[in-house]
């Protein structure tokens, strides 16, 4: 069956489902099994949704899954309702990001009501990703990553919570909310430094926290660096710590060339990602005075 054929069949199923729903509202529904008609309508909406999916009509698929979700709720089938809202969200993601978020939020409300916080957290991440990539609303992405982290923490899924918090920290720093970023990097760094499997990552978190301090105030960065070395002695021998010391020295001397040279040397072994490049450039501008210079690190 071609896509047009699938769409025609889906439209017929939708019409049949609507008839079943109307019939269930009739005066005699109690005598003739109103719930049975609703169950049949649910099944038809779901079949129609899958037909629309095969035809790649994502909005129609999302709408059909939504209709099924509402009927499942009417039947007190919370789990089935939440599943249908998630299916609707996944379909809408390809056509209408805002509607996808609405459906996923509806699913989250049901899951939290059922005490299924780990699943709710997962869907908050999906919403955050839609805000990141489709709607480009970083403040809202941050809010959903934070909510996800809260739910994961409550369920003792600390590794998953930390992943979300690190996303929050990275975006907070980009938005110049440095104190928020510092608190998260320090907290995650402290949590990971005693874990044999994760302690290698701790140096990255302390490095990022120190850079955020540096952008705000050079003295803050010096004091933070001393604190991190005391907390986590392995940090002292890391390339990140050595780079920070060179950058602090260059900044103190207002020596832009020494700063650039130190960054280039570090980058030749460990490639700088976009976030690190942005932060290092912000610090460099304070050496050059009011952002003069070529705005480059190389």
From Swiss-Prot:
Its main location: membrane. Pfam families: SNAP. It is a peripheral membrane protein. GO terms for biological process: intracellular protein transport; regulation of synaptic vesicle priming; SNARE complex disassembly; synaptic transmission, glutamatergic. The keyword Transport applies. GO terms for cellular component: extracellular exosome; glutamatergic synapse; synaptobrevin 2-SNAP-25-syntaxin-1a complex. InterPro entries: NSF_attach, TPR-like_helical_dom_sf. One of its GO terms (molecular function) is syntaxin binding. Interacts with PRKCABP, and disrupts the interaction between GRIA2 and PRKCABP, leading to the internalization of GRIA2. Belongs to the SNAP family. This is Beta-soluble NSF attachment protein. The lineage of its organism: Eukaryota, Metazoa, Chordata, Craniata, Vertebrata.
């Amino acid at each position: 069956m071609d896509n047009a054929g699938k769409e025609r069949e889906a439209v017929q199923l939708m019409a049949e489902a609507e008839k079943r729903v109307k019939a269930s509202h009739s005066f005699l529904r109690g005598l003739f099994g109103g719930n049975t008609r609703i169950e049949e309508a649910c099944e038809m909406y779901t079949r129609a949704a899958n037909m629309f999916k095969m035809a790649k009509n994502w909005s129609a698929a999302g709408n059909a899954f939504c209709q099924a979700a509402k009927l499942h709720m009417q039947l007190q089938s919370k789990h089935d309702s939440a599943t249908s809202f998630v299916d609707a969200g996944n379909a809408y993601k390809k056509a209408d990001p805002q509607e996808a978020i609405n459906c996923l939020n509806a699913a989250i409300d049901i899951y939290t009501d059922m005490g299924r916080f780990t699943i709710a957290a997962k869907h908050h991440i999906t919403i955050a990703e839609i805000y990141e990539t489709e709607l480009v609303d970083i403040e809202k992405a941050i809010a959903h990553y934070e909510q996800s982290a809260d739910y994961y923490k409550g369920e003792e899924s600390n590794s998953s919570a930390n992943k979300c918090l690190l996303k929050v920290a990275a975006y907070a720093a980009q938005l110049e909310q440095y104190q928020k970023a510092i608190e998260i990097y320090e907290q995650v760094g402290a949590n990971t430094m005693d874990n044999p499997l994760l302690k290698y990552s701790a140096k990255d978190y302390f490095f990022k926290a120190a850079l955020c301090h540096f952008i705000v105030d050079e003295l803050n960065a010096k004091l933070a660096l001393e604190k991190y070395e005391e907390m986590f002695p392995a940090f002292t021998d890391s390339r990140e710590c050595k780079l920070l010391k060179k950058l602090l020295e260059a900044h103190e001397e207002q020596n832009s060339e020494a700063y650039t040279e130190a960054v280039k040397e570090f980058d030749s072994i460990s490639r700088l990602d976009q976030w690190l490049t942005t932060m290092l450039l912000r610090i460099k501008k304070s050496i050059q005075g009011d952002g003069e210079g070529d705005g480059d690190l190389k």
